[in-house]
């Protein structure tokens, strides 16, 4: 849920003349898990809604609108493509079970291009195949570091495609469904994370540049209380508001300008 360093967006902008942007709230997010638990609690849903609204605003600043749908991803994509006159879709490649199943269903109804953009290292740049990844993190890290870190440069859209007009499409109801969780009760003193790429960037700047907490990470990383004993980048990474490559680029700049 970001525009900066978005390889899927970058690939789309280089290959199409006009485009529409669609975000799908998967209906399975509201269904209980196989063990009967909620898949998405109020805090996570609140973060998601904020992130989508932030993306919508960022797209408006580029002259584009965001179509927001709720339902089965393949069904929603096909309906939106038919209504918008689109013949292909671009999106970020996923690697988890339900997401790859959704990708397969989408591919069965429309031409789809899935672009790697979720990880720091592109799978093609790893010194081993995905099937040969070590099961222990430290072994994986050592193997990758010995092979040399091959991190691809950040990408940015220079020429935006012409926006497809979607004013006549009234896709409503999703915000009303989530409205009650926009401001869930918060225990005093609990950490509250604000969704969106801008909020993620503010946290990145605060942790590195405003407080230089990165320099004390080894001393504080085992903490359990408070906001600043670790980076707390995870919520923004999980929803794609920040990319791992953006963080790596800023950490590298920090090491060069402040402290290695």
Could you describe each region identified by the protein language model?
Residues 1-155:
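Trp/Phe/Arg-rich N-terminal binding region typifying the photolyase-homology
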Residues 131-260:
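Glycine/tryptophan-enriched, flexible segments
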């Amino acid at each position: 849920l970001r525009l900066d360093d978005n390889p899927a967006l970058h690939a789309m902008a280089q290959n199409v003349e006009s485009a529409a942007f669609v975000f799908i709230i998967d209906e399975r997010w509201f269904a209980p898990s196989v063990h009967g638990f909620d898949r998405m609690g109020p805090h996570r849903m609140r973060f998601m809604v904020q992130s989508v609204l932030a993306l919508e605003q960022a797209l408006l600043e580029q002259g584009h609108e965001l179509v927001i749908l709720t339902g089965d991803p393949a069904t929603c994509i096909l309906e939106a493509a038919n209504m918008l006159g689109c013949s292909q879709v671009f999106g970020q490649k996923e690697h988890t079970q339900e997401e790859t199943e959704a990708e397969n269903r989408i591919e069965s109804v429309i031409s789809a291009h899935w672009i790697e953009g979720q990880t720091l290292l592109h799978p093609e740049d790893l010194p081993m195949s995905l099937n040969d990844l070590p099961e222990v993190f430290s072994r994986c890290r050592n193997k990758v570091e010995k092979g040399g870190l091959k991190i691809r440069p950040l990408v940015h859209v220079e020429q935006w495609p012409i926006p497809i007009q979607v004013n006549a499409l009234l896709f409503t109801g999703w915000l009303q469904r989530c409205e009650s969780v926009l401001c869930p009760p918060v225990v005093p003193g609990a950490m509250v994370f604000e969704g969106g790429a801008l909020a993620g960037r503010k946290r990145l700047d605060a942790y590195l540049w405003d407080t230089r907490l990165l320099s004390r990470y080894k001393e504080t990383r085992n903490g359990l209380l408070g906001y600043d004993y670790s980076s707390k980048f995870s919520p923004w990474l999980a929803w794609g508001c920040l990319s791992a490559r953006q963080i790596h680029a800023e950490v590298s700049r920090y090491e060069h300008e402040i402290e290695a």
